[in-house]
Amino acid sequence: MTEDDFPPDKAARRPVSSRETGSEWQHTSRNLPQRRDLPAFQGSWSWLLLTLLSLGVLMFVFVAWQYLHDEPRGADDDLRPLQALDQTPVIQMPKKVKQFLETVAPFPSGTMPTTPPWLWETPTLSRFFKGNGAALDNLRDLLEDPDWHAAHASWHAADLGSDLRWSVVFVLKQAESAYLSRLGQEEGAFMAAIDLVNLAKRLEKIWAWPSFYSRALEAQELAAQTLAELLKQTRIPEATLRQYQRQFSLCLPSDEWLVQALGAFYLHEKKLLFGPASGEPLDTMPGGGQLERPRRLFFKPHSTLQLFVDQFRRLRMEAQAPLANTGLISVDNAISMHSRRFQPNAEGVAYCTNRMSAYRSLPARLGLAKARGALLVTLFAMRRCVVEQRTLPPSLESLRPKYLLDVPLDPFSAAPLHYDIRLGRIWSVGADLKSQGGAPTSPPMSDDKEPTVEIDIGITSTD
């Protein structure tokens, strides 16, 4: 290192050794690497790296926010049913219904016939009917009570509608009707079937659990089939048939009942999601549960609730829309919900899809129930006409006004039901909206594509 490498003032004061003055030292110093300034582009790389890192952090925060943030709860007042909560202090009906179900004696496992009860052998009918005498008495007592307090909070304590013995109860009433008819007690047979449709109406009004509405539709279907079978060969006077026709008509399901019930079912799902935080009365919590559904990754409670809001709004529209009873809206919607994958609320979508599967078929099932009801009312009027006039009417319109105030319309086509005097049958176009001349089945009206009832009167009766 030479003296020239130091500042002048430093070089002057610094002592110089003899070694540094030698020629070898001076030669070595010239070979040392000299300090050079760094290129300017290395500083720009640092800024670029910092910018990319900041963008990465920002993207991570945004994605995390998408997965963790839940939207605020939206408005749902339009879904609230109009039915007010029953304020009666204490009711006993849920307890009585539970006790009644406990008295039902089903067939031994695997021995229940698969055919309708009117096709059973008489000993089988007799054993089943007489073996459930206590249950039938208890059911009559229940039906004699004019008010089941369907809107009372006590119904929320337990899901009685999901009890498997309801199906046995419905078949039991069919068996009672078939057994009495076989004994020649026609009026008793009709009353057993009317009791079944009356039971269906009672269950239809209980909205605490969705299972009650499904049971109501099941009971209504079996009651209609039983009555259609009885009306084939009845000899009951016209005045008595008129009374049964009126009682049956009062128990028919309606669009308005389903619209209101869907609102109650939405509140049921809301309470399952939020528990007491739903804002609903504590004594109406399903099963008395007070727990809120725990939060977890990919499950956003409020976003999931909004899915239920959208779904129930569409179902209510479908229940009231013309030709919506085929259920096409619900099917398309179910497919669109299943197609949502790999999203922040994937678990919530899957939960909503699974829960809604029990509701999507209700408008279509109601459409079939209304079609069966319209066919039965028309068949009642037809049989009354035959009893009095000893002939079939030339058209359904000719049943007005004595036997029908208005000719029932087909709920699927919004047009009159089809009637063929030569074949002696009346039918609905059914879920496929196509008429193919009727499709008699056993049991009656079991073909969803063309529910049909038979008048069972030969062509010679029309001459």
What are these regions (language model features)?
Residues 2-463:
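Short acidic linear motifs
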